[in-house]
Amino acid sequence: MVTMNRNKVVIVGTGQVGATAAFGIVTHGLCNELVLIDCSAAKALGEARDLDDGSEFQDRHVKVRAGDYADCKDADIVVITVGRKPPANSNRMAELGFTVGLVGEVVDNVMASGFDGVIVMVSNPVDVMAWYAWKRSGLPRTQVLGTGTALDTSRLKTIIGEETGLDPRNVGGFVMGEHGDSQFTAWSTVSLGGKPFARFLADNQDRFASVSTTEIEEKTRTRGNEIVAAKGGTNFGIASTVAGIVQTILWDERRIVPVSTLLDGEYGEHDVFLGVPTELRANGANEIVELDLSEDERTKLHHSAELVREHCEGLL
């Protein structure tokens, strides 16, 4: 039984993503206690002390410490970020062979502690790893989710903001499917200031004649690789995404976020994790919001599901 009191979060993996996610959780005061676990105990201890040293200047004190898997027993959320930096222009699925062994070991250790909270998977390929963690953990479907296309959706809104010069927070809509090459922008859901995006462009051709939805979608898809090529990895965007998901669950905000969650009949798919709009509550991925997608969008979603499902085969 999941019980949430904004008490305790554990992050497994203190590389760039894990450490930056920890920073976001601490600076926003999202929980009472944050525990860091890493294969290098010294690394986890160093990050914990570095984070804790800024406590005087935080709005709300979060106790940060290094720990071990026994700390997962009473944790509300365990965030899994283990993995390695991908090379530039690589496919996220290429990380599967390396990551699956790490994730399997982590999940086994987490569950051996008696954990009964929510697992938030960040490790890539995140849809495959979320499915694998769900199968391996034996937890209910609501209690295992991945970051999915939440970051991609944020990227879409940012890019639309760049193209139009408007605040990206005015943009509604979702990127759906795999967090990877087969992701797609569900343009039927995208709006700007409450107006369907296609209609917005048509009504403002004098200002936005050069704006192309095809180019926006491609920029969204390749944004991650561009960042990796420029700086060697991504950490701020995904860390903000993780912190947002953690806050939404811990604070029972009931926000709709396109996380990677198990499809069990929704959109005609079964036994696959994909990024789809999902109501997040204190119990995790509470309910999938099934949208009225266009025929083309449904075809793209099914294609994405097939790719993810193929990579899940043989993992157990």
Which residue ranges define each predicted feature?
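N-terminal Rossmann-fold NAD(P) dinucleotide-binding loop
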Residues: 18-19
